[in-house]
Amino acid sequence: MSFDEIKTHNKKAIIGIFMIFSLRVFGMFMIVPVLSTYGMCLKNSNIFLVGVAIGIYGIFQIIFQIPYGWLSDKYGQKLIINIGLLCFLLGNIIAWSSNSIWGIILGRGLQGSGAISSVCMTLLSELVLPHNRIKIMGLLGVSFGISFFLAVILSPIIVNMFGFYCLFLINSLLSIFCLFFGMFYIPASLLNKNVVCNFRSEISNFFKILSNRVLCQINLSVFLIHFFLMCNFIIIPVELKKIFEFFEYVPEIIYIVILLVSFLIVLFCICFIQSKVLYSNITITTSAFLFVLCYGIFLLFGHNNISLILGLQIFFIAFIFLETILPALVNKFSSKNYKSTTMAIYSTSQFLGSSMGGIIGGILFSYLNYFEVLFFEFVVSILWFITSILYLIK
């Protein structure tokens, strides 16, 4: 992809979307690593309320993704993006000015209510030519990864130097920068929006999107990969610490190396494989097979450190690959007048997968051992692979 292929006004909008994504991700992930520790020191706090403060963001994201997507289809993306950013800013200000866990919960809830990721991804897809969409999504994934790593590394340092509440002050300032990009970099509208709508027809069209076979497969895929991710984050770190118990920081280094290698391999794939191959249904089937292979390696070779690292490498290659191409597939198969709504359903499936993976993974690991949880994931991945093959046959 050559950046020269993109029109000047589109370049400005793309930069704006990238900045909004990166700054919001950086701000969000600065809070998560330290909230479980420092949240217990807040007024009226307990373990349950700290858990609520962590989880309420995702719950509100699930609730507001589809309404934001539908509204942006009717009233334009710029207005809805800026409303979401205002909610994010207000949430940060409330959390910063509060001295109790209840203020943090309210602030995190308002942050989550600014659920604009699907709207931004839809706009980004509209700004570039079809053959460049997967590549631009890949670059967005890289910026997401960089923001994530910087946030996780810097947040403990900032808290130790300036205190816990400083994170919300920084988040508030980042939110103001996001609003600047939202107001002055995002175009007013790319399409003529028809704000007059019939409620019954809107409900009918919504259920048509839900029942679309291609979109169902895509939504199932994003649900499952995030389900697997959260399950793995519950059980794999424990196993890594057992294997490398005498080597401090080795698990963290392994994760960093694996993610970097995965990003490079995926970038190579999206840059050199033809778009018609990437856009074909075989990509989901191939990725599903990689998940089956990954869990097969985990189960067959047991506690071997090499097999664990190899399995994780395959897992993250498949995960990042699908995370990169699925939004472009959603845009390809969605109706012109319901692109943001369709993307919102996709994002809701994503957050539901993360939530269910964390909950079910935690319950399973409470009653089952490491290999039994992996076997459960292995069976689910096989069923997914079979359904993707059946879809190809049909």
UniProtKB/Swiss-Prot annotation:
It is found in: Cell membrane. Belongs to the major facilitator superfamily. The keyword Ribosomal protein does not apply. The chain crosses the membrane at residues 13-35, 50-72, 79-97, 107-129, 136-158, 168-190, 218-240, 250-272, 277-299, 309-331, 344-366, 371-393. The keyword Transmembrane applies. GO terms for cellular component: plasma membrane. It is a multi-pass membrane protein. Its main location: membrane. This is Uncharacterized transporter bbp_411. SUPFAM superfamilies: MFS general substrate transporter. Keywords: Cell membrane, Membrane, Transmembrane, Transmembrane helix, Transport. GO terms for molecular function: transmembrane transporter activity. InterPro entries: MFS, MFS_dom, MFS_trans_sf, MFS_Transporters. Signal peptide: none annotated.
